[in-house]
Structure formats: C-alpha cells, structure tokens
Curated annotation (Swiss-Prot):
Claim: Disulfide bond is one of the keywords in the record: yes
Disulfide cross-links: C234-C236, C268-C271
GO MF annotation: an example: unfolded protein binding
Protein name, per record: 33 kDa chaperonin
Length: 299
C-alpha cells in the first residue's frame, strides 16, 4: 500500500494479535494556517504544534459530539497554549508569550514553570467535563502520558513532534483484556510495542504514516482504519463578537465605545481577525437588530 497523500488527518490502527491499539496524526496545512496568523518564536511554534497533535489524537480517540479544548498555563515565558478541536475535526490554536524571555534552547520547565494542563470536553448535549493536572514531564509527550496515568486504568503513551512546519503525533494504548488473557504476556506485549516506538528518530517523523508504521511494526499484524481528515477553521464571527458586547450590558457597552474614541475593536486571539463596532452598531445590538455583516471587519 502506498502512503496516503492527505496532509492533515488522524488514522487509527490496531494490533490483531495484541491487546494494543494506536493512532497517528499528521498536521501540515492546518498547522501552517495557525502559524501564518502569528509571528511565534520557534520554541512556541514547536510546543503549539505538539499540543495541536495531542488534541487531534484525543478527538480521534474519543466518541463525542462537541468541542475538545486543551490549555497549558504557567506563570513563565509562555503563560498560555490553547488548542480547540471539534468532533467535526476542525482545529485552531494560539499562544501567548513574552518574546524577550524565549531562549531557543529552553526546556519545557523553563518556558512553562509550575504549569498545569487542563482538558475540557464541551459536548453539544450533556454535561461539560474538565480535568486539570500539573505539567509533569520533560516535554509535552511525557506530560500527556502522565495525564493518562493519573486519569485512566489503561496504559497509554504519547509521542509528539513539531519540526520543519509539520506536526505529528503517535498514541499507543493498551486495550482491556481480550486477545492476551495472561498478565505477563500482556505486559511483555505492551513493553514491546512501546520499545519500538521509542526508536523513532526526529528526522523520521516527516515520513508517511504507513511507511513509518511498517518500519516499526512490520513483524506484527497491524490493521489500519480509514483516515479522518482534519482542517483549520476558526469559529469566530461578528455575531459572537457582538454577543460579547451585549454580555456587558447596554450602559457599559456604550461607555466602552466612548472610551475607545467611538469604535470598539474586538480581536480574535486565534486567527487575528478584527471586528469593529461603533455607537450605531452597539445601538443596533441592543435594539434586537443583531450584527450588521456588512460592517467593517479586518484581518
């Protein structure tokens, strides 16, 4: 089989003779779309790409209808990394950073000291779920692995990479007892697939998923499922920005317009699109007329 030409997708796979499943993610165009909207230093680009890969892997592994949000926060040079991915596989991401404090060779603990990772599942129907753990690991791959150690009974490992404008990720997870009823056999099998994944070299991540999986597990019966395409999309809109003004209340919204010299600018932190509202726009909002799509919007 030839490598798939798609650049942005997740693909699940399973070991037919082991109680182990996996998932691969490839992000080229969507990662590039995020980076094109901001001038991030290289360490920020890399961490944001890794977080995008992890988010896509989690969406691919879960069955829900809604939005998954990952936030990494700290009091350090990178106070925030944030990625959102919907069950429709639309992804966006952003970061906040202190430019003068970003050395090129800084470690995760230096860039995000005393950080924590928050996972939020916001379903279309049902109750919202949120879990927070410390950023415990030398890199984001270790942090996500440790997150799952604390939150799930099944062994789970992450490998994340974002270099050369490409974001990649690999997830391995031990399945409930089925093909391998013996405890020792299950543990040996798990350690075997993990040990092979650890041999991945940085330069190999850019290779096709099927080539890489064959190189790692050519002695195993590995079954690939259909790919799930991903794409960049920002959910911001003039309507949502107008709703943010409405939430302030009419008096405060009008006062804000005056304080801003007659026009309020609302910027999307994800895609950098800017929405402008003057006094007549705000009056229309509170008169129940909604937002005027023809009003000025800038990139």
């Amino acid at each position: 089989m030839s490598d798939l030409p798609d650049t942005d997708f997740t693909q699940r796979f399973i070991f037919d003779e082991r109680d182990v499943r996996g998932e691969w993610v490839s992000l080229d165009d969507s990662y590039a779309a995020v980076l094109a909207r901001h001038e991030y230093p290289q360490p920020v680009k890399a961490l944001l790409g890794e977080l995008m890969a992890a988010t896509a892997l989690l969406v691919g592994a879960m069955k829900f209808d809604g939005l998954l949000i990952l936030q990494a926060r700290s009091a350090g040079p990178i106070p925030l990394l944030m990625v959102e991915c919907s069950s429709d596989c639309e992804i966006r991401g952003m970061a906040r950073y202190e430019a003068e404090q970003i050395p090129a060779d800084a470690s995760l603990s230096q860039l995000m000291p005393d950080g924590h990772l928050t996972l939020t599942i916001d379903p279309v129907k049902g109750q919202r779920y949120q879990g927070t753990v410390d950023l415990d690991g030398a890199n984001l791959s270790e942090c996500f692995t440790n997150y799952f150690i604390q939150s799930q009974q099944l062994n789970t490992r992450f490998w994340l990479n974002a270099e050369g404008g490409k974001a990649r990720g690999l997830l391995l997870q031990q399945l409930p007892r089925d093909r391998q009823p013996d405890d020792e056999e299950r543990e040996d099998s798990w350690q075997h697939v993990v040990a092979l994944a650890k041999t991945l070299k940085p330069e190999e991540w850019a290779e096709g998923n099927e080539t890489l999986l064959h190189r790692l597990y050519h002695e195993d019966a590995v079954r690939l499922f259909d790919i799930q395409p991903l794409r960049f999309n920002c959910s911001c809109s003039r309507e949502r920005s107008g709703n943010a003004l409405v939430s302030l209340g009419e008096h405060d919204a009008k006062a804000l317009v005056e304080e801003c010299g007659g026009t309020v600018e609302i910027d999307c932190q994800f895609c950098n699109e800017r929405y402008f509202f003057d006094a007549s726009d705000v009056a229309q909002l509170f008169a129940g007329g909604g937002t005027d799509v023809a009003s000025e919007t800038r990139h």
